[in-house]
């Protein structure tokens, strides 16, 4: 994931190294031998061969629902458990929002973690779609 974002997006790491956000700019992601190899690496190291079908179905659904516009795609944001609720993730998200405003890009993301919805809402994100995939998947957008 890191390498994909390094090539086709941005990697944000908090000053204390306790939080990280991975960003992809879909309009910059081009299919190449390197991108295919990175996808294969993601499958073998993160997803696993047993979960390929489920993962590909989920990704196809996301592609179908996501608007085809220039965007900042927040692929992942996380804070070490012991460091949560200290504002580290909020600072990181504010930095991403500021950069997205400067680059004139809305931010899109998905989450299945219901307790995170109020947190995203606090930063101006709105749910624009919900899907049932044996769990609830929420699609969020923060406009400019």
Regions found by a protein language model. Give the residues of each.
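A generic structural signal for well-ordered alpha-helical segments
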Residues: 4-6, 100, 120
């Amino acid at each position: 994931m890191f390498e994909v974002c390094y090539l086709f997006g941005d990697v944000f790491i908090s000053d204390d190294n306790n939080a990280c956000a991975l960003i992809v700019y879909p309009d910059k992601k081009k299919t190449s031998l390197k991108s295919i190899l990175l996808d294969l690496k993601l499958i073998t190291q993160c997803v696993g061969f047993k979960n390929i079908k489920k993962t590909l179905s989920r990704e196809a659904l996301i592609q179908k629902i996501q608007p085809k516009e220039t965007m900042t795609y927040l692929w992942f944001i996380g804070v070490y458990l012991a460091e949560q609720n200290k504002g580290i993730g909020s600072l990181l998200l504010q930095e991403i929002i500021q950069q997205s405003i400067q680059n004139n890009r809305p931010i899109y993301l998905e989450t299945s973690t219901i307790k995170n919805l109020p947190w995203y809402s606090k930063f101006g994100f709105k749910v624009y779609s919900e899907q049932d995939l044996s769990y609830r998947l929420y699609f969020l957008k923060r406009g400019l």
